[in-house]
Design a protein with these regions (language model features):
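Short, well-structured alpha-helical segments in soluble
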Residues: 98-110
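A short, small-residue-rich loop immediately preceding and capping a beta-strand
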Residues: 108-128, 139-143
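Catalytic or ion-coupling anion/metal-binding cores of large enzyme and transporter domains
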Residues: 2-55, 60-81, 86, 92-95, ...
Length: 580
C-alpha cells in the first residue's frame, strides 16, 4: 500500500504575535510559556466509572504525565469513550470503530508531537491500535492490567470463565443460590482491571505487547500492583524518546510484528476475537492479514501457557511465572526477533536476560500443552468465506461431528436488534433435542445483530445439563467471549443477514464439522441450497439514523476485520458510484 504518510504537526509558536489565540487558550488552563516551549504530548485516557477495567486510570494517567514532565515534555490529557461489554445494551464491537475514529481524529488534529494511550478492555486496545496505525505519529500504549484472582472453598477462581462453569452447575441443580451468591461476592470481582483469565481483555493487552506497542513486560502486571504505576511512568518517559528518535507506528507494525502477535495468541490460548482485531489493525497499517495466516501460524505454534480458559491458572499467576515476556522468550526460535518495538529496541534486545520462573505454567517448546496453537479455520458449504474454531477450548470428541441442526429462536428487542434468549425459551424450543444435535444461532453477525455479540456459547437445555452434558457443537455468525469455552464454530461468513448459507439452514438439516480437516458443511444438495437462497429475503435494518446506521451501511465481514469500508478501501466510493 506504499509508504505511510508522516502527519503534519501544528506547534505552538511562542514568537508569532498572531498565534496568541492558541497560546492564550493554553495559558487559560494555568500553563506558562515555559511549559509551551516543551514538546506537547497527548495522553489519551478513557477513564470511566462505567468500566471497572479503566477505573484506576486517573492514577495511571497521572503517572504517565509525571514521566512526560520528567523527560522534558508537556503532557495534555484528553478523553475518549470507554467500553465494558457488561454495561452496554448492545455489542461493544460497534463502538470499537467509533472509538478508533474519535481517537485518531484527536491525535491527528491536535498540536501534539506524540501520544500515550491508556487502555485495558476488549475493544479499547484494538481501537487505539487502529487509531495510532492510521495517524502514524509517535505513540505508545500502556495497558491497565488484570484484576486479582479470587478464592472459593480453596479454589482459585476468576471471572468470567469460572462464572460460566458455576452458572451451568446452578442451572443443572448441583449448586444452590447461596453458593452462587458467595462466589459472586467473594470470588470473581475483587479488584479493578481486566477479567483475570486470558479472555479478550488480557488477550488484547498481550497482543499490544507482542506487536511491540508497549514497553516490555507491560501486559501481565496486575492492575492494582505498584509495578503497574511504575510501568505507566516509564511509558511517559519513553514517549519522549520515541518523539526524539522519530520512531513511528509504521516502524513497528510490520508483517513480522503481526505474525509474532499471532504466535503469542496461539501459545497462550488467547481469544478468538483477536482474529477480527488483528486483521483490522493490520489493514490500517497496510498489512494484508488473512484467515489463512492464522491457520498457517496456528499449525506451527505450540500452546505452552497453562492459563485459563484453556488452561488452569489465572493471568496473575502467569505474571508471577514471567508473563508475556517469558512466553515470548520461550517462543524466540519461532519469532522474528529483529522487529522494532516501542522500547526503541528490537525484540531480541527486549528479551535479553528474561527467564521463565515457573515451567509448570509456561511450558518449554519441548514439552508443550498441545503441539499446535488450538485454533482452526474451517470452510465449506456452510461457511464459504471461513469460520473460526477455538479447538483449545473445545471438547476433543466434538471436533469431528455430524448431527442434525437445531435452530435457536431469533429474539429481537422492540428496536429490532438481537435480544437475549432465556433459559425457559431454550428449554421450550429444545425439549426434544439430544447431545448429538448441532445448535445453530444466526442473524447475530456484524450486520444481523448488529455488532456480533458474544453469544457463541449460548445456554444448553436443562434436560441435557441434568444428564451431565456440558458441551455441544454450536454454529454461529457471532463471537464468543475470550473467557468462554466450548465447541463453538464462530464468525461464520458470510453472515446470515447478508445471505450466507447459514440463513437457510432448516431444523433437522445435517451439519458436518471436521475441525482438523478445516471443513464445515451443510449436508444438503447444492441445488436445494441455491433454491432456498433464491427465495430468501434480507431482514430490514435495525437502524436508519445515527451512528448505528453508519455501522450497518459500512461494516465489513468478520474475515475483513469488521472495520468500515471507507477506512480500509480507498476505492470504495468509486465502487459505490459504479454500482449506482
Amino acid at each position: 500500500m506504499g509508504e505511510r504518510k508522516v502527519p503534519h504537526v501544528r506547534k505552538i509558536d511562542l514568537e508569532d504575535p498572531l498565534d496568541g489565540t492558541l497560546r492564550g487558550h493554553v495559558r487559560a488552563m494555568g500553563y506558562t510559556d515555559f511549559d509551551m516551549a516543551r514538546p506537547i504530548i497527548g495522553v489519551c485516557n478513557p477513564w470511566s466509572e462505567l468500566n471497572p477495567g479503566h477505573w484506576h486510570f486517573r492514577a495511571l494517567g497521572d503517572a504517565v504525565k509525571r514521566g512526560i514532565w520528567a523527560a522534558g515534555g508537556f503532557p495534555l490529557e484528553f478523553p475518549t469513550i470507554s467500553m465494558c461489554e457488561v454495561f452496554h445494551d448492545i455489542s461493544t464491537l460497534i463502538y470499537r470503530n467509533l472509538m478508533a475514529m474519535s481517537t485518531e481524529e484527536m491525535i491527528a488534529s491536535m498540536p501534539i508531537e506524540g501520544v500515550v494511550l491508556l487502555s485495558t478492555c476488549d475493544k479499547d486496545v484494538p481501537a487505539q491500535a487502529m487509531a495510532l496505525a492510521t495517524v502514524n505519529k509517535p505513540a505508545i500504549i500502556v495497558t491497565g492490567g488484570t484484576r486479582l484472582a479470587g478464592y472459593y472453598q480453596g479454589e482459585t477462581v476468576a471471572c468470567s470463565t469460572d462464572t460460566q462453569r458455576f452458572t451451568w452447575e446452578y442451572k443443572a441443580g448441583t449448586i444452590g443460590e447461596c453458593e452462587m451468591r458467595e462466589v459472586e461476592m467473594n470470588g470473581f470481582y475483587n479488584t479493578c482491571g481486566a477479567c483475570g483469565v486470558m479472555g479478550t481483555a488480557n488477550s488484547v493487552q498481550s497482543m499490544a505487547e507482542a506487536l511491540g506497542l508497549t514497553l516490555p513486560g507491560c501486559a501481565s502486571i496486575p492492575a492494582v500492583y505498584a509495578q503497574r504505576i511504575h510501568m505507566a511512568e516509564a511509558t511517559g518517559r519513553q514517549i519522549m524518546r520515541l518523539v526524539q528518535q522519530d520512531v513511528r507506528p509504521s516502524d513497528i507494525l510490520t508483517r513480522a510484528a503481526f505474525e509474532n502477535a499471532i504466535r503469542v495468541q496461539m501459545a497462550t490460548g488467547a481469544s478468538t476475537n483477536l482474529v477480527i482485531h488483528l486483521i483490522a489493525i493490520a489493514r490500517r497499517a497496510g498489512v494484508d492479514l488473512t484467515l489463512a495466516d492464522f491457520q498457517r501460524i496456528s499449525e506451527a505454534t505450540p500452546f505452552i501457557a497453562d492459563v485459563k480458559p484453556c488452561g488452569s491458572v489465572t493471568v496473575e499467576e502467569l505474571y508471577h511465572a514471567g508473563g508475556i515476556r517469558a512466553v515470548m522468550k520461550t517462543l524466540a526460535p519461532l519469532l522474528d526477533m529483529s522487529v522494532m518495538t516501542a522500547s526503541g529496541q528490537t525484540l531480541a534486545e527486549n528479551l535479553e536476560g528474561v527467564e521463565v520462573r515457573d515451567p509448570r505454567i509456561i511450558h518449554p517448546l519441548s514439552d508443550p500443552i498441545q503441539s499446535s496453537g488450538g485454533l482452526r479455520i474451517v470452510r465449506g458449504t456452510l461457511a464459504p468465506d471461513g469460520a473460526v474454531v477455538k479447538t483449545a477450548a473445545a471438547s476433543p470428541h466434538l471436533l469431528r461431528h455430524t448431527g442434525p441442526a437445531a435452530i435457536i429462536r431469533d429474539a429481537r428487542t422492540a428496536d429490532g436488534r438481537a435480544g437475549s434468549v432465556s433459559q425457559e425459551e431454550i428449554d421450550q424450543d429444545f425439549r426434544e433435542i439430544t447431545a448429538d444435535h448441532v445448535i445453530v444461532s444466526r442473524y447475530l453477525g456484524p450486520i444481523g445483530a448488529p455488532g456480533m455479540p458474544e453469544r457463541g456459547p449460548m445456554g444448553l437445555p436443562t434436560h441435557l445439563l441434568r444428564q451431565g452434558v456440558r458441551d455441544m457443537v454450536r454454529v454461529v455468525d457471532c463471537r464468543m467471549s475470550g473467557t468462554s469455552y466450548g465447541t463453538v464454530v464462530l464468525h461464520v461468513a458470510p453472515e446470515a443477514a447478508v445471505g450466507g448459507p447459514l440463513a437457510v439452514v432448516q431444523d433437522g438439516d445435517m451439519i458436518s464439522l471436521d475441525a482438523q480437516a478445516g471443513k464445515l458443511d451443510l449436508l444438503v444438495d447444492e441445488r436445494e441450497i441455491q433454491r432456498r437462497l433464491a427465495a430468501w429475503t434480507p431482514p430490514l435494518p435495525a437502524y436508519r439514523v445515527g451512528y448505528r446506521s453508519l455501522w450497518l451501511d459500512q461494516v465489513t465481514q468478520a474475515p475483513e476485520g469488521c472495520d468500515f469500508h471507507f477506512n480500509v478501501d480507498p476505492e470504495w466510493r468509486e465502487k459505490q458510484a459504479r454500482r449506482a
